Curated annotation (Swiss-Prot):
Task of the protein: Plays an essential role in early steps of chloroplast development. Involved in the regulation of plastid gene expression. May positively regulate plastid-encoded RNA polymerase (PEP) activity through binding to FSD3 and CITRX/TRXZ. Involved in redox-mediated regulation of chloroplast development. Possesses disulfide reductase activity in vitro. Required for the proper function of the plastid transcriptional machinery and protein accumulation in thylakoid membranes. May function as molecular chaperone to ensure proper organization of the nucleoids in chloroplasts.
Localization, UniProt: Plastid, Chloroplast; Plastid, Chloroplast stroma, Chloroplast nucleoid; Nucleus
Official protein name in the record: Thioredoxin-like fold domain-containing protein MRL7, chloroplastic
Disruption phenotype: Seedling lethality due to deficiency in chloroplast development. In the rcb-10 mutant, impeded PIF4 accumulation leading to lost warm-temperatures responses (e.g. 27 degrees Celsius).
Compositional bias ranges of the Acidic residues kind: 142-160
Upregulation: Induced by light.
Native source species: Arabidopsis thaliana
Outcome following mutation: R291W: In svr4-1; retarded growth, pale green leaves and enhanced non-photochemical quenching (NPQ)
Effect of A275V: In rcb-101; restoration of thermoresponsive PIF4 accumulation in hmr-22 background, and suppression of hmr-22 mutant defects in chloroplast biogenesis and photomorphogenesis
Gene that produces this protein: MRL7
One GO term (biological process): regulation of DNA-templated transcription
């Protein structure tokens, strides 16, 4: 059963307290904890009451305040004494670090030279008599080469000034190449192979990989020559000239759209040649759109190339030189 028990006056026998005595509460101003407990009929437990809001002594508060004031009064005096004895800032240490390698090498050379001179003096003291000690380490401020260059300066208005001295020993570049001209390679048939002159005026334009998209991805006919300038130059030159003759035939006809013709140097445009799977030179590729219709690796004359172009682009009869098995049909 539940009872309200007051800890300070709980009897041993079971009893029920419904309230607190008014006189008792007046005598003891401090509130008491009252809580329910279960007490058996045989024994009643004693409980201790503890006040949560105990009244503090006002004198103790005054004592703590006075102690705080005394501490505050003492601390500035102690700080001033410490400031007088010790500096406010810790002085910085001198910078320490590795010396540069150049300084270390210079010190090592100097010390080794001094040791060498001292040993020489001990062995033969007459060596350094009436002679100043040579400075073997070159001074950075003095440069003998600059002094020599300053002495060699010649005025621009000198009448003896040689012509085109920047090119050579007073020889003009034009005079040199007049006496020693650059000769082009001569082919097997006696024709001169002029790759540089062919760039300026040619029926077959040379392109690079950046220009490839504008030429390849177009529905009009395209003939591509993959060649090498300096390897099998005679064969590459002859194939180029035969292709130029065949292209010129269609340009002169004027009754239909002539095919476009470009050439690619295998040694320069390596990535483009790899993409086209062109490993041997010379070879001619017949393209339409983005597809290679046929790959010709053998040498063909201009007449044979005219028939091949007519077959692939203008629906003409297939010539005998075209292998049907290697032709890729255009859809």
């Amino acid at each position: 059963m539940s009872f309200f028990a007051v800890a300070c006056s709980a009897p041993r026998s079971s009893m029920l307290l419904t309230g607190l005595n008014s006189s008792f509460s007046d005598m003891h101003r401090s509130p008491l904890f009252v809580f329910p407990v279960t007490i058996s009929s045989r024994s009643v437990k004693r409980f201790a009451a503890v006040s949560s809001d105990s009244v503090l002594d006002p004198e103790s508060k005054n004592q703590t305040r006075s102690r705080r004031k005394n501490k505050e009064a003492v601390t500035p005096i102690a700080e001033t004494e410490n400031n007088e004895k010790f500096p406010t800032k810790v002085p910085r240490k001198s910078k320490r670090g590795r010396r540069s390698e150049a300084d270390a090498v210079e010190d090592y050379v100097r010390s080794s030279l001094e040791r060498t001179f001292s040993t020489i003096k001990e062995q033969n003291p007459e060596v350094f008599e009436n002679k100043e000690k040579a400075n073997f380490i070159k001074d950075r401020g003095v440069d003998e080469e600059e002094e020599e260059e300053e002495e060699m300066v010649v005025e621009e208005e000198d009448p003896d000034w040689p012509v085109d001295t920047d090119v050579g020993w007073g020889i003009k570049a034009s005079e040199y190449f007049d006496t020693h001209p650059i000769k082009n390679v001569v082919g097997d048939d006696g024709s001169e192979i002029d790759w540089e002159g062919e760039i300026d005026d040619s029926w077959v334009k040379e392109i690079n990989c950046l220009e490839w998209e504008s030429f390849a991805f177009h529905p009009s006919p395209l003939v591509v020559l993959v060649f090498e300038r300096y390897k099998r130059a005679s064969d590459n030159w002859k194939t180029l000239k035969e292709l130029e003759k065949a292209i010129k035939v269609y340009w002169d006809a004027k009754d239909r759209l002539p095919p476009r013709a470009v050439k690619i140097d295998l040694n320069i445009e390596t990535d483009l040649a790899y993409a086209l799977k062109a490993k041997e030179c010379p070879q001619i590729l017949f393209l339409r759109g983005n597809r290679i219709l046929y790959r010709e690796k053998d040498f063909r004359t201009a007449d044979e190339l005219v028939h091949m172009i007519a077959h692939f682009y203008y629906k003409a009869k297939r010539p005998s030189c075209v292998d049907k098995a290697n032709v890729t049909p255009y859809c």
